[in-house]
Amino acid sequence: MSDIEAQRIAARIDTVLDILVAGDYHSAINNLEILRAELLDQVKDGISPSQAPGSPWEI
């Protein structure tokens, strides 16, 4: 995992944590499911994160 990839994942986790602090548990869980699916797809397809499209985050 590259440093850039790790930073992007950490930033997305921070977003989920912010959503949890705000009390919107449904959106936080949904965002974690989106992140999980994208990570699994990258591993399956062998796509580097820099080539992967952005995700539809809900806040």
Swiss-Prot record:
Disulphide-bridged cysteine pairs: none
A Pfam family per the record: YciZ
Alphabetical list of InterPro entries matching this protein: UPF0509
Superkingdom, taxonomy of origin: Bacteria
Family: Belongs to the UPF0509 family.
Protein name stated in the entry: UPF0509 protein YciZ
Organism whose genome encodes this protein: Salmonella typhimurium (strain LT2 / SGSC1412 / ATCC 700720)
Lineage, broadest ranks: Bacteria, Pseudomonadati, Pseudomonadota, Gammaproteobacteria, Enterobacterales
Name of encoding gene: yciZ
